[in-house]
């Protein structure tokens, strides 16, 4: 009986150490992911993104999209504020039959500057309403600068399709593509985990 207990203890400690190593990897990757966005390193961002997304949209199309979003255009420009990396939280690592997955939450703040327009109060309220519907906490710094804060989450996936390396997808419940990439069990868990996380954030804020 004692021998069986020791065997179980060794197996359990091995599992916990492996899980801890995966969690550390996901934490490190999420920190790097935020750095890459800050530096506008689009190749680096794409290298960390789940290959199904890259196959769907093509690398050059994705780079063009990132440039349009993060480098702005004649209408607006977007700046990402330095993220608080100490606020990144990584979940336990879960498993389906073929896929390992986990979640990493982090705060992100963006500053949007409207280049050719000053928004009056009614337009500001309309913009804020749209951003709030997307889970943002928006406030206007002045009549052409909007600051938006959000608690974001990425889904980390590891299976044969990722070359058994951790790859990442931004969690957005309205993004239908996630349904074709993320296993059903993992998607349900992501929805539950994110909702619980947001509820805890609200409780801590009160």
What are the functions of these language-model segments?
Residues 1-24:
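Bacterial Sec-dependent N-terminal signal peptides
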Residues 3, 35-44:
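Short, compositionally biased low-complexity segments
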Residues 18-35, 39:
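Short, low-complexity N-terminal intrinsically disordered segments enriched in polar/charged residues
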Residues 20, 31-32, 48-55, 142:
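Second-shell loop/turn segments in exported
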Residues 27, 43-101:
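Short solvent-exposed beta->alpha transition segments
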Residues 108-114:
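Beta-strand elements of well-folded, non-transmembrane domains
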Residues 119-206:
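Low-complexity, intrinsically disordered terminal/linker segments enriched in charged
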